[in-house]
Curated annotation (Swiss-Prot):
UniProt xrefs under InterPro entries: ACP_syn_III_C, ACP_syn_III_N, FabH, Thiolase-like
Protein name, entry field: Mycobacterial beta-ketoacyl-[acyl-carrier-protein] synthase III
Subcellular location: Cytoplasm
Region of interest: ACP-binding: 259-263
Subunit field text: Homodimer.
Protein purpose: Catalyzes the condensation reaction of fatty acid synthesis by the addition to an acyl acceptor of two carbons from malonyl-ACP. Catalyzes the first condensation reaction which initiates fatty acid synthesis and may therefore play a role in governing the total rate of fatty acid production. Possesses both acetoacetyl-ACP synthase and acetyl transacylase activities. Its substrate specificity determines the biosynthesis of branched-chain and/or straight-chain of fatty acids.
UniProt EC number: 2.3.1.301
Family statement drawn from the similarity comment of this UniProt entry: Belongs to the thiolase-like superfamily. FabH family.
Keyword Lipid metabolism: yes
Length: 335
């Protein structure tokens, strides 16, 4: 019997660079409160958000992904032809088909490469990163562009006091490839579909097409349910990720949780028993919740400000719609 050949790749994989794109329009809490009965103080005290970015009408998940990726590629001193895989994590590429990734790959000059989307809500980046690392270790690719990109502002009902101040726009990309030392630990991931309705689109597109004069679909969230799940379950996931990587809490230099809510992240930091001097990402304050883009955007900000250094040991935890989660320990990229 003929034996089917298999491939194998390098085992030592890491983050080579990170690039970010933030839309130019800054939206304050006061502007949000023009549509709801709330205040800047109330929003900030419950979410940690002061300002956020909204994309321009002509911008899309794809266009923002392209801009972020150009920065990541330039920082790594590579070109599009050096990349042999593109994975886009997004929930807001507003076409059923084609996927966002092939559009991005073509714009960047990545020719004839596997390019596909991951739809896992706010944990999408962690899923995409885990898949990319496994693809490289399995020999399917050598250098992969992993992108989180979202244009959430059009999906939000700006009169919905429960979430209109949370979900926003932005994109960030990382290049994943060979590293002299291991730079990406095993991914701990999973889902709880019993709570699928906790973050959802309230009306499906077929129902809307059949009744176009009726209410349009919007993103809805059961905030209390999500808060409880994230605050008390994601600490366990973070510990599992550290255990899988053979890392202890006091060895973590940087904690980059999904930027959903600063109160959730404060509880996670406490539950994980990280060092008092560990750097905790708080990009949410001026960026808001960019879903799949939030972790790489926060990573880029920490490096840009010098709060974190290349090579620092970082714990990433993404969590959100599904309900889904993905976590891993990584080394911060060089640029």
């Amino acid at each position: 019997m003929t034996e089917i050949a298999t491939t194998s790749g390098i085992s030592s994989v890491g983050l080579l660079s990170v690039g970010a794109y933030r839309p130019t329009r800054v939206v304050t809490n006061d502007e949000i409160c023009e549509n709801i009965d709330s205040s800047d103080e109330w929003i900030y005290s419950r979410t940690g958000i002061k300002t956020r970015r909204f994309a321009a009408p002509e911008e899309s998940a794809a266009s923002m992904a392209i801009e972020a990726s150009r920065e990541a590629i330039a920082k790594a001193a590579l070109t599009g032809s050096d990349i042999d895989g593109v994975i886009v994590a997004t929930s807001t590429h507003f076409l059923q088909t084609p996927a966002c990734a092939p559009i991005v790959a073509a714009a960047l000059g990545c020719q004839n490469v596997p390019a596909f989307d991951i739809s896992a809500g706010c944990s999408g980046f962690g899923h995409a990163l885990g898949i990319a690392a496994d693809m490289i270790r399995g020999g399917s690719a050598a250098t992969i562009l992993v992108i989180g990109t979202e244009k959430l502002s059009p999906t939000v009902d700006m009169t919905d006091r429960s979430n209109c101040f949370i979900f926003v726009d932005g994109a960030a990309s990382v290049l994943v490839g060979h590293s002299p030392i291991q730079g990406i630990g095993p991914t701990v991931w999973g889902s709880d579909g019993e709570q699928a309705a906790a973050i959802r689109q309230d009306i499906d597109w077929i129902s809307h097409a059949e009744n176009p004069a009726g209410p349009r679909p919007f993103l809805r969230m059961e905030g209390t349910a999500v808060f409880r799940w994230a605050a008390f379950e994601m600490g366990k996931v973070g510990q599992q990720a550290m255990d899988a990587a053979g890392v202890k809490p006091d060895e973590i230099d940087v904690f980059i949780p999904h930027q959903a809510n600063s109160r959730i992240n404060e509880l996670l930091t406490k539950n994980l028993q990280l060092r008092p001097d560990a750097v905790i990402a708080n990009d949410i304050e001026h960026t808001g919740n960019t879903s799949a883009a939030s972790i790489p955007l926060a990573m880029a900000e920490l490096l840009a400000t010098g709060a974190a250094k290349p090579g620092d040991l970082a714990l990433l935890i993404g969590y959100g719609a599904g309900l889904s989660y993905a976590a891993q320990v990584v080394r911060m990229p060089n640029s």
